[in-house]
Amino acid sequence: MNPRRKKRLTLAVALIGGVAAIASLLLYALNSNLNLFYTPSEIVNGKTDTGVKPDVGQRIRVGGMVTVGSMVRDPDSLHVQFAVHDSLGGEILVTYDDLLPDLFREGQGIVAQGVLTAEGKLEATEVLAKHDENYMPPEVAEAMGQKHEKLDYSQQKAPDTK
């Protein structure tokens, strides 16, 4: 092989190796920032199409309805624990150590983002609450499908307490 051809081959191999290294670093960075969406039933039973369950320590997003009566606040800190359920009967405990959104209430839809622990709890780093009675996060609406049950409110007014 003459020196000119050898120099071109070395340059081509180095260029291909550099592109491969950059591509692998890019894919690694994207993979570490990937947050997969799960419903409580999918965390317990696995995804319906693949049966894949999230791994302990994996960063995920969970969407569903806050279970009425499940919220427990620590009186000395911002720590709060509540359960999130879906229409298929799955339920997961969520712990959060920050201020909850103003619109957060039991019985309403939320999306919590955080890390799954070994006990099957979600240590949330962010909690998003729905905005009004008609809004539901797209992932939650799609996952719950037609089985979402709205709360019924009567037109009867509360008695005057004055």
UniProtKB/Swiss-Prot annotation:
Residues 153-162 have a biased composition (Polar residues). GO terms for molecular function: heme binding; metal ion binding. It is found in: Cell inner membrane. The chain crosses the membrane at residues 9-29. InterPro entries: CcmE, CcmE-like_sf, NA-bd_OB-fold. GO terms for biological process: cytochrome complex assembly. Keywords: Cell inner membrane, Cell membrane, Cytochrome c-type biogenesis, Heme, Iron, Membrane, Metal-binding, Signal-anchor, Transmembrane, Transmembrane helix. Heme binds at residues 131, 135. Residues 30-162 are periplasmic. HAMAP family: CcmE (MF_01959). Belongs to the CcmE/CycJ family. This is Cytochrome c-type biogenesis protein CcmE. It comes from Shewanella sp. (strain W3-18-1). The gene is ccmE.
